[in-house]
């Protein structure tokens, strides 16, 4: 990290403000060559952390833009190095011209996530907090943003560190026993060590249990609309999203492929898939669509099974119901409530639970449907920021938990201290990967490569 990096930190589309970002040992010199304060003093001599009015000038003294600049001296900066931001007008042309000037005076184009990677490597944040930065940027719901903010504040990091410290106490005791084999573990010490391992196991179990909700919160709930052809699935999709996303006709089989859309219902983010109607068909294209419908249902967390309340159930309805039953959660939606209902709702409720009546045509019952979906995915009771939200985190916790369980069992059944120590060390290694204390450089590069440039 001996070089200085630069990047455009804001979206490259016309806007009121655009930001150029710098970090590294040569930040002050690069600034002095590009940004010229109105008060006449070089930027390197300006008061730190104070916005300074000036101009960005090219090599021939021509004005590129009037701008504001702020210097953040290291180590008390985002990256732990000297950092700076130039706040220009948000023209992509102006921002790119400004970036070219920074690069021409010795800065290097930053890679994706490189600013945050430097913050991690310089000890300004751990790996969990660094991942929270990306989660905040990518957040599609307020709940996701709140959880990421809590994680950035260190909520998850502190929970992990508490388990890490407990296991360090266990391993230090077993190091002493291994180094001095003539010492036996007294009964009281054995119980204390068992309690410590049990406490760690319970906390890791709780953390791992948050992953499924963290994934649904971050990625959204995979939701499939199922039903026979022409039952109103596309009309329901359009009613939910609020515009004509899918083609609606009176011709059965109009939807021949899956149609996907995202929808925020309160705190629940749905990844909606409108499927081809479930039926046997001789049409090759429609048959492929039906097969995709079945596969979408297998991947779904929620199936919305749509039935036509104005006509009796048919074989195609039974086929759709059989597919819906494979989903972890399912809601039966009886469409066309604006027409007389001829279905046996009691039988449907006995098989599927609650049955909701809606009219995709008039909008009747849509509010109740949204409430029912929200009730299936309530806001959790976990502290804000203490949800595992990606597979890397879950895998590390899963490995740590397995090692802790093995260590507890080994100690309980009188295995030799070195056996217990090996498992306890394995748990520490996994937790070290989780928060970045002990992690391979190539894994760090992979994690930060997923970030956007400028962050």
What are these regions (language model features)?
Residues 2-8, 12-15, 54-55, 142-264, ...:
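C-terminal-of-GTPase-core extension/linker across diverse P-loop GTPases
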Residues 52-65, 69-73, 253-281, 299-302:
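Switch I (G2) and immediately adjacent beta-strands of P-loop GTPase domains
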Residues 272, 306, 333:
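Generic enzyme active-site microenvironment
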